From Swiss-Prot:
Keyword Plastid: yes
TM ranges: 5-25
Organism: Cuscuta reflexa (Southern Asian dodder)
Name of protein: Cytochrome b6-f complex subunit 5
Known role: Component of the cytochrome b6-f complex, which mediates electron transfer between photosystem II (PSII) and photosystem I (PSI), cyclic electron flow around PSI, and state transitions. PetG is required for either the stability or assembly of the cytochrome b6-f complex.
Amino acid sequence: MIEVFLFGIVLGLIPITLAGLFVTAYLQYRRGGRLDV
């Protein structure tokens, strides 16, 4: 059951991480800055 629990956590974290990256890139784009990491 631990594997299923960890799998659920990962599936929940992936969309949050992608959303965070998208928002960060969008804010940088709006400020006119290049996407240099």
